[in-house]
Amino acid sequence: MERNSEEYNRILDELTGYCTESGKIDQNLYVNYDVKRGLRDSTGKGVLTGLTEISDVIGYDVIDGERVPTDGRLYYQGYNVEDLERGFHGSKFGFEETMYLLLFGKLPNEQQFKRFVEMMECYRELPRKFTRDVILKAPSKNMMNVLQRCVLTLYSYDDNPDDISIENVLRQCMELIAQFPVIAAYGYQGYKHYFHDMSLVIHNPKPGLSTAENFLRLIRSDKKYTELEAQVLDICLVIHAEHGGNNSTFTTHVVSSTGTDTYSAVASSLGSLKGPKHGGANLKVQQMFDDLKSNVKNWDDEAALEKYLTGLLDKKGFDHSGLIYGMGHAVYTNSDPRARILKGYAERLAQEKGRTKEFELYKKVEEISGRLLAARRRSGKPISANVDFYSGFVYTMLGIPIELFTPIFAIARIAGWSAHRIEELVNAGKIIRPAYKYVGTHREYLPMEDR
């Protein structure tokens, strides 16, 4: 049988039908057995599966036993992220301080920070010929695929890959944190060259520059960027670095609990983050706004904007999902602190780039969407913009291509993954093994000729 022949496709369709039918489970059984689908209870609250000191995500206050909506708060190792952002103001090394804080549980003094940055600069260099042999010789249209493949391949370049002592895991994590921006940037350059016939431009990272500065330098042919651009990207990395028990971080814990190597654990987390329900959400926001702009020509016409957004909720527009992307969050109620921070930087960047009218459009959509969603939900829970709402807009103003939107998330979040992997290993927990209840029937085996 030949692949893609008529007979091949017919059999594949038949087998697909078997899979679909066999995999169906009566949805009422999930209720009958009180299954916590998505590891959340009926109110949307996450099921407690572990303890951590790395971050705290607060979306509501509890008063007299009742959950009361409040402005969201996010803490890294006990520090409010909004306080960190104010402390980092004007700096381009906020992400480096955040790395240190997440990994070691405290903010560094000047000497500690200097040594840490010097170590990260050493780790940033990829193995000899890795760029040519691994990144450029096997280009991909998806940069998350590039990151995942490169991480697994780096296992082969490590003289001690399977040692899960804390010292070795820390060394591996610091190397990967430093190398992620370089791999993503080079992967994108290879993608442009091989799939779009553009000139291949490979710059070397420059010592003394921050992660944000080096990333902008690596993806731009002229290597130029403004102070504000570097500051904004730095803050983007800070606010994406960690966020509690999200899917990819939980994946880090699950895989690390098996005792496997760092490269396998990080590659698994990348696979989680790649999913459109997780790390790919900001891309959906950008695509939704592109569709809005093609349908609503007058951005000052709030009635037209409301009509378009109502159409989205009625599954009559864009991707017919019934969703307004970038609105609402599983934990936050009144507001997402990351969105509050990013909104302010988006406004500053829009002024520098001459895109204030577009920023005003985002503000209008945020306000109208929140009102429409709250009216439809009827739960009394406020609906606010999440971090994905403004991040895509910020990235476009920074000239970052959509192919790198989710990789930027990974460049930031690997700091959090690393901290959680180390925390899992330090506490030597049991292998994570949740229960699945069998709801099928037991059958007797029949010989093939009797089936």
Regions found by a protein language model. Give the residues of each.
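Non-transmembrane, aqueous-exposed alpha-helical and coiled segments at domain scale
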Residues: 1-451
